[in-house]
Design a protein with these regions (language model features):
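Divalent metal-dependent phosphate-bond-processing catalytic cores, especially two-metal-ion Mg2+/Mn2+ enzymes
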Residues: 2-129
Length: 129
């Protein structure tokens, strides 16, 4: 691709990733992933999903085994945003933080999501420094 075309493709991809965060907040995860609220609330997070997240990679679909993995996977889209303005928008709009305010009855999952929020705050701050 020429540089101009690549620029437009990256802008569209960034916008799509940001919109995916919005959709996953506005539409109940139970509806998107065809899972019961009970299954979602007791869901663990797959260790391989956490490994990919902490390596700052987008989580591959093939790694996801549990419903909570989808929220982690969507949050990991932030690592592939191309432009500083996209990162600023993600933080400002708040969809990411609302997605990560994941309601769970599983204490290990609650701890994982707290750590994920902390890591994303740290990572976003480092990107804007």
């Amino acid at each position: 691709l020429d540089d101009r075309t690549r620029l437009f493709c990256q802008i569209l991809r960034d916008a799509d990733k940001i919109d995916i965060l919005r959709v996953n907040v506005e539409t109940p995860m139970e509806e998107i992933y065809n899972v019961s609220t009970a299954a979602l609330r007791r869901s663990p997070v797959t260790p391989a999903v956490l490994d990919a997240f902490y390596a700052h990679h987008c989580v591959l679909h093939s790694l996801k085994q549990y419903p909570a993995d989808n929220a982690v996977g969507h949050a990991s889209l932030v690592f592939e945003l191309c432009y500083p303005e996209s990162l600023r928008i993600v933080d400002e709009q708040g969809w990411l933080w609302r997605l990560l305010d994941f309601k769970t009855d599983n204490p290990d999952t609650a701890a994982a999501f707290a750590a994920i929020r902390d890591e994303l705050h740290r990572w976003l701050n480092a990107q804007s420094a």
